[in-house]
């Protein structure tokens, strides 16, 4: 029996380094950043949720359910993950940021294979050099653990997942897959890379 996998795209941050612009809606090569992300993951999952804490109406125009953090105060990616984990009945939830327009087209199958090979609860993607703490495949049943971690004042995703049985899924063969956009300068460099 194949596993059912849903996804959440995290677009709930304040994007301070982008001058406060909503990163998911910033245009890259004529399309909103999040549209690039949607196009990469849509064929790999059953349902997509968009986690947004502002501009929810604009995000809804992409045709997917928009969810806002159940914890107020822009508490970071953990808050978005917790909310999404409570909105899915899938076997696994794929977590990706809204500003990674080059995500692997084989992201889900490789992360799922890594989980199954190790009988792990969580797979975290790696570019071969660094783990990508907000590119995860995890079991929604871990929600209570994550919620307790956040409510204890913790914010770092990697500090949470190291407490669980996790496996690293390497994408060293796609070193640019997780390039993201945090500044206008990075956006310009990425726009050039996409057109090459």
UniProtKB/Swiss-Prot annotation:
Keywords: Cytoplasm, GTP-binding, Magnesium, Metal-binding, Molybdenum cofactor biosynthesis, Nucleotide-binding, Transferase. Its cofactor is Mg(2+). Disulfide bonds: none annotated. Mg(2+) binds at residue 99. InterPro entries: MobA-like_NTP_Trfase, Molybde_CF_guanTrfase, Nucleotide-diphossugar_trans. Pfam families: NTP_transf_3 (PF12804). GTP binds at residues 10-12, 23, 51, 69, 99. One of its GO terms (cellular component) is cytoplasm. GO terms for biological process: bis(molybdopterin guanine dinucleotide)molybdenum biosynthetic process. Monomer. The N-terminal domain determines nucleotide recognition and specific binding, while the C-terminal domain determines the specific binding to the target protein. This is Molybdenum cofactor guanylyltransferase. It comes from Shewanella sp. (strain W3-18-1). The gene is mobA.
